[in-house]
Amino acid sequence: MKQILFICPRNPFSERYSGDVIRAKKFIYSLSQNNYVKVISLDSKDSQKKESRLSYESFKEINFFIKIFYIIFSLIKIKPLQLGYFFSPKIKEYVQNNYQNYDIIFFQSFRTAQYMPEDNKKKCILDMGDLMSENYKQTSSRYFFFNPIRVVYYIESLLVKKYENFCFDKFTKILLLSKKEMSRVEKKYKNKLAQISFGINNINKIYRFHQKN
């Protein structure tokens, strides 16, 4: 039985009707059938949940003004603004202090990739889902040319694109939803990609590359 650390940007047990939350919950319960899964995320308050083969711990989100500071800091470092918005020093500290206790670290969304431990030698899997840089670029094009929202989305698309390439370099495997998304990725990263559809039955494919890699 493998020990898996599963990092989410949001509480996967919140019953929130959101694609990333639903997808994360399905992954967690599928993985917990044959492994022990420790799940951590941000939430509105500190909380814990425990079942036979999984446990969950949430870390309270930082206040809005500190978030603004982290967002600005992300921009200064030429990184996506979302990394600052979803950053938690408590999660960063928890991962750095505990990752050695796990066989695999599973990151849900590029927003959690910033928690990859320094000098990490563990298998790290990133469920990217979609290439968000493409989504933001398309969203940007829908706004009037001089609309400041268009500028924000366009800049974020460039920052996310740069960060996606960073993730392709650093992670053992990258999960994407569709072949269309996979076709947009540079050829040198193709061997790191795996298509995992939204269906719960297809999530079991994840075990194959755990065994191969």
Task: List each model region and its residues.
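Membrane-proximal helix-turn-helix segments that form the acceptor-binding/catalytic region
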Residues: 26-27, 89-96, 132, 149-174
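Short beta-strand scaffold positions
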Residues: 107, 176-177
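Carbohydrate-associated surface elements
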Residues: 180, 199
